[in-house]
Amino acid sequence: MIKSFKPMLVATALSLATLAPVALAAEEQFFPIPSYRVGPYGANGQSFYGGFIDYLTYVNMKDKGVNGVTLTYEECETEYNNAKGVECYERLKGKAAKSSGPVHTMSTGISYALIDKSAQDKLPLAMMGYGRTDAVDGSVFPYAFPLVTTYQMQASAIVKFIKEKLGGNLAGKKIVYLYHDSAYGKEAIIAMEAEASLNKFTLVPIPVAHPGNEQGAQWLKIRQEKPDFVVFWGWGVMNQTALKAAQKVGFPRERMIGSWWTGSEEDVIPAGDAAKGYMAATWNVAGKDVPLIADIEKVVYGGGKGNLQDKSKIGTILYNRGVSAAVLSVEAIRKAQEKYGKGKAMTGEQVRWAMENLNITDARLKQIGATNLLPEIKTSCDNHEGSGKVKIQQWDGAKWVPVSDWIEGNKALIHPLFQASAKQYAKEKGITPRDCSKEM
C-alpha cells in the first residue's frame, strides 16, 4: 500500500502542476481601438485616446482590472480616414472574437461605415457624441450606441441656451449654422430646422469644405447676414480658422457657440486672443479638479505608465472626454459581468446587453471619483443615448469655464426625428425592429 501510494502522490502533484497555470491565468478583456494620432485631426486623437487608454491602465493598476479581469487593447492608425478605419476594424475584430469592449472610432464617417459590419460581427459600436444619431433607436440598431448625447439633442440644447440669452423669445431672430461639410456637420441640420420652425427664427446654413482652412467667403456672408448668433459645427483646423475669421470681420465671439468638437484647448489656444469669450457645448468638463483625473495622474503617470508624451494634455477637454468614454465602457464590462459571470471576460454580445442596460447614477460617478465629469446615463432598448444633456462653457483666454448647468435638448421634438429615420432605415434594409417591451 505504501509503495503504491508514493507514485500516486507524484502523479497527482504533476497533474496539479500542469493545471495550475491554466487555473491561475488572469482572464483578459480586449479593447479594439481604431484610433488616429496623425493627420489633420491627430492632435485631437492624441488627447482623446490618451485619456481612454490611461483609464484602462488605471483600472488595471488600481483595481487589478474588473473583478480580476485584466483590460487589454490594441490600436490601429486610421488617420481619420473612412477606408483606413474599416481596414483597422477588420484587422482588429479577429482578436475581439472571444472578448470585446466597445469599439470607439471617434469618427462619424468611420462609424457610418461600420454600422452594418459591427452588427453582423456582434461587436458593440460606441459613438459618444458623434456617429449615426438615429441609432438612438435600439430596436433597429441593437449594436450601435450614440451614448450620452447626440448632435441633434446638442443643437436643441444650444438653441435653448441662446433663447434664454436673448430674453426667452427667438421669433424674428436670425441664427447662422456654420458647419463642416461632411456627415458630421450635416447631422444637426434637421434639428436646427425643427427648432427654427418651432421658435420662428430664421436659419441660415453655411457649409465649409474640408479641412476648413479657407473661410473668407463664408465669413463675408455672415457679415452680410448680421445674425444674432452663429452656431458653429467645426472640426480640427477649421475651428481656429473660424475664430480668427470672426475677429477679422468684427463678429463677437460671445455670440458664437460651437459643438463639443469645436470646444477643446486644441481649438482655442492656437487662435490666441481671437478665441476669448467664445462658447461651446460639452458633455464632459475640463480640469484636474475632478478627483478621478487627479488620481489617474498620480497613479498612472506616477507609476511611469502614462500613454501621453505631452502630460500638459492631462485634464484638457478631449483628454477628459477619452477618460469619460473609457469609464462608460468599463462600467459596461462591469454590468455585463453582473449578469454573465464576475471575473470572466465578456463577449461583444454580452457587452452589448450591458450597454443597453446602463444605469450610471451620480452616486456611482461619485464612487468612481467622476462627480460632474459627465451627466448621469440610463439606457434602454429604445434609448441608446441615455442622457441628452450638455453644458455650455466659455473660454476666458486661459481655461474653459462652465456658464450653465446641464441642459437637456427638446426630447419631444428631437427623438421622433430619430425614430422616423430609423424606421426608414429598417424599411430600406429589410430589418424587423425588435419589440423593446420584451427586452430585459
What is the predicted function of each stretch?
Residues 307-319, 330-405, 409:
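Segments of small-molecule ligand-sensing domains
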Residues 246-326, 421, 433:
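Extracellular/periplasmic periplasmic-binding protein-like sensory domains
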Residues 19-25:
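Sec/Tat signal peptide C-region and signal peptidase I cleavage site
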Residues 28-30, 43-50, 61-138, 147, ...:
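Beta-alpha junction/loop-to-helix N-cap segments that form part of ligand/metal-binding clefts
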Residues 28-53, 76-83, 107, 178-187, ...:
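Extracytoplasmic "Venus flytrap"
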